[in-house]
């Protein structure tokens, strides 16, 4: 298990590179946002997910976010193909 630490400051987020940490962009026209995170395994890799606050965007791979930064949750699970697969629930990354 890895705690999902939210960063408001994008530059600090990119500099610190804390495993499992995340930064969320402001909403676009359709309400979609970018959820950028460092891999919970600690490898230092970074990825971007398309999310919606309370909804799953319709086009392309996307996730429904619960709107919380303190106890963030994403659905469905996050599958970083060939690398890491798990859930973000109650602010904690849990590997499958």
Language-model segments: which ranges?
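Polyanion-binding surface elements
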Residues: 42
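A short Gly-Trp-Pro
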Residues: 2-38, 46-96
